[in-house]
């Protein structure tokens, strides 16, 4: 039998709602924190056994239904020739931001077996270590989000330089997006060949675009990636309530909802012919359990036992989250939904 999450993503009947958490592999876990005291994130990625260990830790501690392959969305662009540093409390910093078509044409479209063999080895290690009912989720960044980092040179909230490039130099923008989307498609296909059961596209900042600009400048490139895979796909962004229908049209067996969009409304808008993932506010886990429980029950009630729901947070686990609360949340969802499935 296929992993629970894979069956849910295909909207098949499941014995309970699958649960995993974005950013579950990392900053809240003691094992990961100990490793990061001596190694940078990219250093962890380049050590397959260590990368696999970090990926598996939350599955063992929380009992979640999926491992998400530990990596960073900027990892594939290193193989393109980009000098990127992950700066603590800042994020990705690019030494030479993309400013011209000449800069774009310097970027290679690498073969993953040559640029990230360590990640592919780690994928195989994790898949072999997981129980058959547990899924392995691989991921890549959305082309818009990563292009924004490459053009801005560092994280931003307004994406002024990025939009200026889109509007003033569309030929530069589209050539950059072509190279990114092809690189990312090769990257996630290689992860699937190595053992990933599903792929999530994280377009974290695409909500900065208007609907019209999303459809012109971003959606075709996400569609290229999501449409090029043989395994279930999850399409996720934050602040994207105004884009949901267009994101669904761009692809994804499952559409990830952030915490701002009521689940029932979001599912209605993307269509019940696909699944949804989400969408508890991550900040609730910093507060009293009673509120977590009530909000979780409301989400499950909104899902209504309909095939295709994957329970997750509406964004990544926050750094100050108590790991024990994640296990408790997973247990709550399993308990509630197993009872519903058993009653059918």
What kind of region is each of these model predictions?
Residues 89-128:
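A gly/proline- and charged-residue-enriched helix-loop-helix capping module
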């Amino acid at each position: 039998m296929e992993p629970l999450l894979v069956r849910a993503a295909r909207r098949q009947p499941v014995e309970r709602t699958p649960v995993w958490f974005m950013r579950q592999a990392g900053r809240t876990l003691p094992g990961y924190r100990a490793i990061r005291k001596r190694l940078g994130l990219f250093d962890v990625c380049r050590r397959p056994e260590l990368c696999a260990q970090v990926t598996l830790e939350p599955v063992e501690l929380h009992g979640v239904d999926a491992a998400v392959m530990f990596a960073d969305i900027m990892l594939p662009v290193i193989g393109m020739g980009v000098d990127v540093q992950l700066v603590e409390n800042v994020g990705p910093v690019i030494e030479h931001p993309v400013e011209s078509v000449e800069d774009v044409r310097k970027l290679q479209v690498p073969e993953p077996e040559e640029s990230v063999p360590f990640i592919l080895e780690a994928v195989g290690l994790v898949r072999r270590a997981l129980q058959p009912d547990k899924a392995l989720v691989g991921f890549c960044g959305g082309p818009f989000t990563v292009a924004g980092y490459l053009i801005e040179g560092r994280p931003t909230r307004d994406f002024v330089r990025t939009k200026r490039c889109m509007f003033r130099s569309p030929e530069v923008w589209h050539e950059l997006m072509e190279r990114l989307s092809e690189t990312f498609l090769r990257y996630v296909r290689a992860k699937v060949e190595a053992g990933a059961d599903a792929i999530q596209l994280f377009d974290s900042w695409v909500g900065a675009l208007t609907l019209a600009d999303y459809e012109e400048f971003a959606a075709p490139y996400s569609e290229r990636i999501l449409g090029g895979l043989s395994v279930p796909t999850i399409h996720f962004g934050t602040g994207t309530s105004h884009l949901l229908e267009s994101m669904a049209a761009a692809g994804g067996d499952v559409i990830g909802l952030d915490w701002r969009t009521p689940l029932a409304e979001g599912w209605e808008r993307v269509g019940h012919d696909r699944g949804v993932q989400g969408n508890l506010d991550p900040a609730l886990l910093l507060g009293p359990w009673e509120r977590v429980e009530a909000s979780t029950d409301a989400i499950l009630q909104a899902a209504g036992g309909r095939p295709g729901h994957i329970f997750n947070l509406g964004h990544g686990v926050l750094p100050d989250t108590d790991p024990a609360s994640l296990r408790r949340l997973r247990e709550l969802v399993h308990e509630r939904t197993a009872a519903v499935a058993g009653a059918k």
